[in-house]
Amino acid sequence: MKKRIWGSILAVATAVSMLDGCGSSATSWTVTCPWAPSGVAAMVSQKAAAMSPDYSDSMILVADAIKGDAATVNTWVADTKADDTELVFAGEGLFAITSLVDPEKMQFTYDDFVFVENLYSSIFVMSADAKLNIAGIDDLKTFLADAPEVSVAVNGATSSEAFLAASLIGSMGYGDKLKLTPYSSAAEAAQAVARGETNLAVSHQSQILETYQQGGATIVCAFDGEDITDGAFAGVEGVGKYGYPYFRNRCFVLARSGTKEETVSELKKLYDDILADEKMQTWLKDTMMLEEDLMTEQDVKEHIENVKSIVNEYYEIVVGS
């Protein structure tokens, strides 16, 4: 509670300072990120908030990160009503994983929100301890066949990363060898292979880049339909082209259900304009190793259902590892 109060004070202070330079007619919208303040979503949210005065005279985005995942969103839903100037992030982790694996943690459903926009798309990658010389799908198959046990670092025991690892190794026929090793953040999990704590890791590309460049890890594959085409990981194989399951990580920007349609449309336009900015796109691609990925509500629902199908199929591997 203290963290939320302090976060709210900071958000209001930031909004006031921004409004001083933008005119009193602008309304501040607090954007709650329920994950680590140093994480990918929080960083993109801060960037979008800083750019919002350039694209709207009536709305200012104020980034507020409160680590807590489902608990943070529970509080947000309880404290927010239709037309409140509040937004929150959620993704497949909550709507497709927590809803099936730990439903008691969720005091909300998708119907409690109205979709505004998707903030970004992230293609997770699997990395390996460099000493293992695993540099592609064929190398991974050979390693899995010979190893008595395979440890994979992930951000949380039942996270998106955990299910991606389970779906790949499980679909290869080695789910019984999988040992998921959960860490408290995605960045920490990404560094586990370099420290020799695990054989493999699943992470955002940006979180393993430095370790890869320093020779501490190899990149095994990308959880996407095709190979990565740009950046430091260009040429890394996409698991989808081999028929293995995958999904991208998305970050949905949501308002409270019942919020006026014209307000939601204005918010969507603001985010779309920010994400179309050339500087933002360059930063997303080159610094964060993310993609602009505008979505419709139908796209969101299809994404959630795809992830749910993977969770249902590989649930026993994850919870039993």
Where do the PLM segments sit?
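N-terminal (or domain-start) structured segment
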Residues: 23-112, 158-161, 171-202, 207, ...
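Short, low-complexity disordered leader/linker segments with a strong preference
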Residues: 1-28, 319-321
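Extracellular/periplasmic bilobal clamshell ligand-binding domains
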Residues: 295-321
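C-terminal lobe and pocket-closing loops
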Residues: 207-276, 281, 302, 306-309
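Residue-level signal for short, function-critical loop segments
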Residues: 35-37, 156, 223, 259
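Solvent-exposed coil/turn segments that connect beta secondary-structure elements
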Residues: 92-94, 121, 131, 206, ...
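C-terminal capping/gating helix-and-loop segments adjacent to ligand/active sites or protein-protein/ligand interfaces
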Residues: 274, 278-294, 316-321
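Hinge/capping helix and adjacent helix->loop/strand transition within the periplasmic-binding protein
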Residues: 28-29, 49-57, 76-85, 100-188, ...
